[in-house]
């Protein structure tokens, strides 16, 4: 299904109005390079499950950040809606992303949060260009 352009603009605008929930301790700071595989995910969480979801995604994100092919794993929370999350994951390749999805920590996250998520939309992307730089 093709989405209207305004829906894409809203998704992109999430970056402008989101706040980062938690940094990933010990996460490597690396540049995103053209060709990197991105998984961008919009999630609406059942309000009563927000704290449980945050604990589960933080555990998953911290483990993912240590994977060899993971360049970035950001957990963002919409400033105007505490139950709306946006995940921005960058991997060296689609194979690295698939390895993440096959990991035990991801399987645990998926099973734990299955009933916490009211709505989920995942958008696979590739980095075309980036102004991110390693520090």
How would you name each of these model-derived features?
Residues 36-44, 74-101:
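Short, well-ordered beta-strand segments in beta-rich or mixed alpha/beta enzyme
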Residues 49, 83, 105:
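Short phosphate-engaging motifs
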Residues 36-66:
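N-terminal targeting signals for Sec/Tat export/insertion, comprising classic cleavable signal peptides
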Residues 5-8, 22, 58, 62-71, ...:
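An amphipathic, aromatic/His-enriched active-site/gating alpha helix that lines ligand/cofactor pockets
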Residues 4-6, 16-35, 75-80, 110-135:
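Glycine-rich beta-strand-turn "strand-cap" elements at beta-sheet edges
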Residues 45-47, 93, 126-129:
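Non-catalytic surface loops within mature trypsin-like serine protease
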């Amino acid at each position: 299904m093709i989405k209207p352009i305004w829906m894409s603009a809203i998704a992109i605008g999430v970056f402008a109005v989101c706040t980062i929930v938690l940094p990933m301790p010990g996460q490597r700071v690396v540049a995103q390079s053209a060709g990197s595989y991105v998984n961008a995910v919009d999630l609406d969480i059942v309000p009563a499950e927000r704290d449980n979801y945050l604990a589960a995604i933080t555990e998953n994100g911290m483990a993912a950040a240590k994977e060899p092919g993971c360049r970035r794993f950001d957990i963002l929370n919409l400033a105007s809606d505490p139950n709306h999350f946006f995940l921005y994951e960058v991997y060296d390749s689609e194979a690295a992303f698939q390895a993440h999805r096959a990991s035990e920590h991801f399987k645990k996250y998926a099973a734990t949060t299955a009933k916490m998520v009211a709505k989920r939309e995942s958008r696979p992307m590739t980095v075309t260009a980036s102004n991110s730089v390693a520090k």
